[in-house]
Regions:
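Conserved PLP phosphate-binding loop immediately N-terminal to the Schiff-base lysine helix
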Residues: 1-4
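Conserved core segment of the aminotransferase class I/II
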Residues: 6-87, 190
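PLP-dependent enzyme catalytic core of the Aspartate aminotransferase-like
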Residues: 13, 136, 151-195
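Short, solvent-exposed loop/turn elements at beta->coil junctions and helix N-caps
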Residues: 21-24, 106-107, 145-150
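Conserved C-terminal alpha-helix-loop-beta "cap" of PLP-dependent enzymes
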Residues: 42-43, 47, 117-160, 168, ...
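Conserved glycine-rich beta-strand-loop-beta hairpin in the small C-terminal domain of fold type I
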Residues: 80-94, 106-121
């Protein structure tokens, strides 16, 4: 993966990109520490703006993070613990999707290499129906199109699956139900197209 700041600099556009990061999902939600990377000129501008926007950063929280993580190696080790907890959940969802939907050509997904979500693309015009059917059956999903600005997916096809919270047993049942909702919504769309 190319490092975008260096690539922009090489291309003569060093001020084009701002990169943001947060420990919010690493340490504890709502109290994470944010970080930003940008060109020297952009960082100078940001510092000038922050002088008048922020009276003082939460230094106690910053200290708490430094004491807990110590350095980048501490963060890496902590993230490995997260991976050990989350990996089986992601593997389970992907296995059920492969088993129930693989080869049917009514949806596609990518096995993520990190992160907290699986991006699922249904047939165009089906995402909202899938999410609604799942909710009616007792499985609450992230809103259809949540990955798009203002939640407006022009194809009504994208669903963000978040397997991090439910226990593994519940996750299997929920994913099977999700797959059933994908099948039902897809059949409804395809039959409607035949009219």
């Amino acid at each position: 993966l190319l490092e975008i700041l260096m690539e922009c600099k090489k291309a003569g556009n060093p001020d084009m990109v701002y990169k943001f990061s947060s420990t919010s999902k690493i340490s504890f939600p709502g109290s994470g520490i944010a970080a930003m990377a940008a060109s020297d000129a952009n960082l100078k501008d940001i510092r000038n703006m922050m002088k008048v926007q922020t009276i003082g950063h939460d230094k106690v929280n910053q200290l708490r993070h430094v004491r807990f993580f110590k350095d980048i190696h501490g963060i890496v080790e902590h993230m490995k613990k997260h991976a050990d907890i989350l990996r089986p959940k992601f593997e389970t969802v992907l296995e059920v999707l492969d088993k129930e939907l693989g080869g049917l050509e009514i949806g596609s997904w990518i096995a993520p290499r990190g992160g907290y979500f699986i991006s699922f693309d249904a047939l165009d015009g089906c995402a909202k129906a899938i999410v609604a059917k799942a909710k009616e059956a007792g499985v609450v999903l992230t809103g259809a199109g949540a990955t798009f600005p203002y939640g407006k997916d022009p194809h009504d096809s994208n669903i963000r699956i978040a397997p991090t919270y439910p226990p593994l047993g519940d996750l299997i049942v929920a994913t099977e139900l999700f797959a059933l909702c994908v099948k039902l919504s897809s059949v409804e769309k395809l039959l409607k197209g035949m009219e």
